[in-house]
From Swiss-Prot:
Cofactor binding remark: Binds two Mg(2+) per subunit. The magnesium ions form salt bridges with both the protein and the DNA. Can also accept other divalent metal cations, such as Mn(2+) or Ca(2+).
Function, as annotated: A type II topoisomerase that negatively supercoils closed circular double-stranded (ds) DNA in an ATP-dependent manner to modulate DNA topology and maintain chromosomes in an underwound state. Negative supercoiling favors strand separation, and DNA replication, transcription, recombination and repair, all of which involve strand separation. Also able to catalyze the interconversion of other topological isomers of dsDNA rings, including catenanes and knotted rings. Type II topoisomerases break and join 2 DNA strands simultaneously in an ATP-dependent manner.
Domain of life (superkingdom): Bacteria
Its EC number(s): 5.6.2.2
MF annotations from Gene Ontology: ATP binding; DNA binding; DNA topoisomerase type II (double strand cut, ATP-hydrolyzing) activity; metal ion binding
Name the UniProt record assigns to this protein: DNA gyrase subunit B
Pfam families, sorted: DNA_gyraseB, DNA_gyraseB_C, GyrB_hook, HATPase_c, Toprim
Binding annotation for Mg(2+) 2: D509, D511
Gene symbol of the encoding locus: gyrB
Marked site positions, Interaction with DNA: K460, N463
GO cellular component terms attached to this protein's record: chromosome; cytoplasm
Binding site for Mg(2+) 1: E435, D509
UniProt keyword Iron, yes or no: no
Cofactor dependence: Mg(2+); Mn(2+); Ca(2+)
Length: 808
């Protein structure tokens, strides 16, 4: 903090620094022009980003090193920083405080005065006033001049002038709390994951700034800290955490003093077959690239050409390389700071500042070529990868030519297994990609042949994450799919205009095998036809796993979770849980308990692979699945838990469970026909991820299961000792009077059932595939489908809690 405080200079950032371009009415009339889409959630989240960007501008100027974003219980958001604090003096032109000017006048702020900020982000350069205009209410607190100032707004209108509410405050900074307007936004619920991604991105781009994200909306608060001293080099390693790097990161940091443009670059080649380049200007992502991206690509091609010519390595190559070959497996984060950037649109998705290109191209060419010359061994490995890419591209070209020659001799270019639709208009045509010939036959009978085409895929789908392009083209299933779609597949041939269907629907079984095939197909589309996803043409069908019949009524349920939910809901209104014969849980209170028990049950199922499930549950609901089990004071509680366990597992062939405590382990044992059965619980296991989560959840239901419980459903009574007993009793009661049919696959349905549940546009449910954050999607596909095991293990461990029922 001391360095930041030393840089503080009130006179350099005061009311005179605030420049004004007036008018807020247009913001309320056309909010989408200023904040983004108000219907899909992007504009809502940009409200937070606009305020955060102002704090980051303070950090870029050297005055702020801590930003905090808090999602409050009432639905509002608070963003605070420890910067200089917004100026509070009276603005000469406006006659009101500078803080009020900033919050009520469009295009008002320090970023419009070049002496205040050298470079700045901000969403659209329209200022935080847009956030105020689109908020039901907003509260601004400022700590400056050893005082605390407060001003409030309703629908963008000032309640009262800025006022001092505290004095002798040894603090500097700004805090904005706002509640989005329900009249503007379709939905005002913020998504933690979306915000988390953007804040992590900002923390990587602004090394040394600590960003805290706190979610207070739920019973258990959630807090994530983002702080990276490694900057964008750490960002590249984070993005590529599931891949093998060919060499250490190449890092470039340079500034052009004449133009004021600075460049940060971190890059490395990995063992994958896909390029991943992220471009930023003043901390804002350009998804469509621009002059900085063009300059970078040109520079890299020049570097490789120059290095090959200098070393003579080009003589070893069988094929000439292209720019695409040089970028195969390249992961790069390119961040430029530009004093006055120009973009192609309000959303800043493409940089068009022409002065950026020569600065970036010259800097990248000079510095990266220098690195190549200083690291001959690593450079040789990179060149070998590029040559391999060129050879694979040539092999793919020959494979395509062979395919074209074969197609020219055929009467129809469409694959034989495709049952095409009659419609020729892609806008109304649908293609169902179906798992297997059996399901394909049923789908062909049940479809609406006017608009629905069926393509059955039989056999193993290729994992394109681990396959080169030429190998992919050699796959029968992938080749059939490419031909049916009609678009071509690589950058040279792909044409979205040639797509024959504007709904491409993946329809697989609702089991683990179906999920795996679906993931393989999603990997193909993400890697080789991302345009289909971007345009919203790719969907996932939702076939049911169960058919339930109750009396004359029949209905379908999507999966195990939906069936369990139905059985619980059909029982809960007729159920009463009595505690010690006195207190009763019914209705919403009982449902709340059951929801916790369902999650608890799922955790126990997951942990049962590592330790006995029954023992784990008994210890957890007695608050003993932790180090308390080693304490003498817990012996009576442990014996009570064993008594319950033995009553549940009573058997004439087995003795009761007994326990022996050791220094670092607890042994549970019993004898079955003279043979000893032993379960060892190690002290270190108690600190494992699974057991800690089970213990946390068990504490929320501990008080209930510490009592004598009786479940009454209609006229039937059940004695309840454990959470599993309670859940099983509820579910079994729900099964009475109904028949349940489980479909093992789509082929088990008849054509009418498939039409009613999955094909009929009027009744079906489709999930549209969208990629909200490209680099997060990149990481997930690399983690799940790549060949690095450790990141996949960590991913499964981290997300295990989200799986309540796993159908295996």
């Amino acid at each position: 903090m001391s360095e930041i405080e030393e840089k503080f200079n009130e006179s350099s950032y005061g009311a005179d620094s605030i420049k004004v371009l007036k008018g807020l009415e247009a913001v309320r009339k056309r909010p989408g022009m200023y904040i983004g889409d108000v219907g899909d959630g992007s504009g809502l989240h940009h409200m937070i980003y606009e305020v955060v960007d102002n704090a980051i501008d303070e950090s870029l100027a050297g005055y702020c090193d801590l930003v905090r974003v808090t999602l409050n219980k009432n639905g509002s958001v608070t963003v605070s920083d420890n910067g200089r604090g917004i100026p509070v003096e009276i603005h000469q032109e406006e006659g009101i405080s500078a803080a009020e000017v900033i919050m009520t006048q469009l295009h008002a702020g320090g970023k419009f005065d070049q002496n205040s900020y050298k470079v700045s982000g901000g969403l659209h350069g329209v200022g935080v006033s847009v956030v105020n205009a689109l908020s039901e209410w907003l509260e601004l607190r400022i700590w400056r001049n050893n005082k605390e100032y407060l001003i409030r707004f309703n629908n963008g209108i000032t309640e009262a002038p800025l006022a001092v509410v505290n004095e002798d405050i040894n603090k500097k900074g700004t805090e904005v709390t706002f509640f989005p307007s329900v009249e503007t936004f379709t939905n005002i619920e913020f998504d933690f994951g979306t915000i988390e991604h953007r804040l992590r991105e900002l923390a990587f781009l602004n090394s040394g700034v600590k960003i805290l994200l706190v979610d207070n909306r739920f019973e258990e608060a959630k807090e994530v800290e983002f702080y990276y001293t490694g900057g964008i080099e750490a960002y590249v390693k984070y993005i590529d955490r599931a891949k093998h790097a060919v060499h250490p990161c190449i890092v470039v940091n340079t500034e052009n003093t004449e133009s004021g443009i600075s460049l940060e670059l971190a890059m490395h080649w990995n063992d994958s077959y896909h390029e991943n380049i992220l471009c930023f200007t003043n901390n804002i992502r350009q998804r469509d690239g621009g002059t900085h991206l063009s300059a970078f690509k040109s520079a890299i091609t020049r570097v490789i050409t120059s290095y090959l010519d200098t070393t003579g390595l080009n003589k070893k190559s069988k094929n000439d390389f292209s720019g695409e070959d040089t970028r195969e497996g390249l992961c790069c984060v390119l961040s430029v700071k530009v004093p006055d950037p120009k973009f192609s649109s309000q959303t800043k998705d493409k940089l068009v500042s022409s002065e950026v290109r020569p600065v970036v191209e010259n800097a990248v060419y000079t510095k990266v070529l220098e690195w190549f010359e200083e690291h001959p061994a690593e450079s040789k490995a990179i060149i070998a990868k590029i040559m391999e890419a060129a050879n694979a591209r040539e092999a793919a070209r020959k494979a395509r030519e062979l395919t074209r020659r074969k197609s020219a001799l055929e009467v129809s270019n469409l694959p034989g297994k495709l049952a095409d639709c009659h419609a020729k208009d892609p806008a109304i045509s649908e293609l169902f990609i179906v798992e297997g010939d059996s399901a394909g036959g049923t789908a062909k009978q049940g479809r609406d042949s006017k608009i629905q085409a069926i393509l059955p895929l039989r056999g193993k789908i290729l994992n394109v994450e681990r396959a080169r392009f030429d190998k992919m083209l050699g796959s029968d299933q992938i080749g059939t799919l490419i031909t049916a779609l009609g678009t071509g597949v690589d950058n040279r041939e792909f044409s979205l205009e040639k797509l024959r269907y504007h709904k491409v629907i993946i329809m697989t079984d609702a089991d683990v095998d179906g999920s795996h095939i679906r993931t393989l197909l999603l990997t193909f589309f993400y890697r080789h036809m991302p345009e289909l996803i971007n345009k919203g043409y790719l969907y996932i069908a939702q076939p049911p796993l169960y058919k339930v019949k109750k009396g004359a009524a029949e209905f379908y349920l999507k999966n195990e979770q939906a069936l369990q939910d139905y059985l619980i809901k059909s029982t809960i209104n007729d159920a009463t849980l009595t505690l010690d014969g006195k207190e009763q849980l019914v209705g919403d209170n009982l449902e709340e308990l059951i929801n916790k028990v369902v999650k608890f049950n799922g955790l126990l199922d997951h942990a049962s692979k590592k330790f006995n499930r029954s023992i784990t549950e008994i210890l957890a609901i007695n608050d003993l699945l932790n180090n308390k089990i080693f304490e003498l004071e817990s012996d009576s509680r442990l014996q009570k838990a064993l008594d319950v366990l033995n009553s549940l597992e009573e058997s004439p062939d087995k003795t009761n469970w007994e326990v022996l405590k050791h220094e670092n382990k607890v042994e549970f044992f019993r004898f079955s026909r003279g043979l000893k059965e032993s379960k060892i619980l190690l002290k270190e296991q108690l600190e494992s991820f699974e057991f800690v989560q089970i213990s946390k959840l068990a504490l929320t239901i501990f008080d209930i299961f510490d009592k004598q419980l009786k479940l009454i459903v209609k006229s039937q009574e059940f004695g309840i000792l454990t959470a599993s007993q309670l859940l099983n009793a509820i579910i079994e009661c729900g099964k009475r009077g109904i028949s349940i049919q489980r479909f093992k696959g789509l082929g088990e349905m008849n054509s009418n059932q498939l039409w009613e549940t999955t094909l009929d546009p009027a009744k079906r449910t489709l999930l549209q595939v969208r990629v909200a954050e490209v680099d997060e999607a990149e990481g997930i596909f690399s983690t799940l489908m790549g060949d690095v095991v450790e990141p996949r293990r960590l991913f499964i461990q981290a997300n295990a809690l989200n799986v309540v029922n796993l159908d295996v």
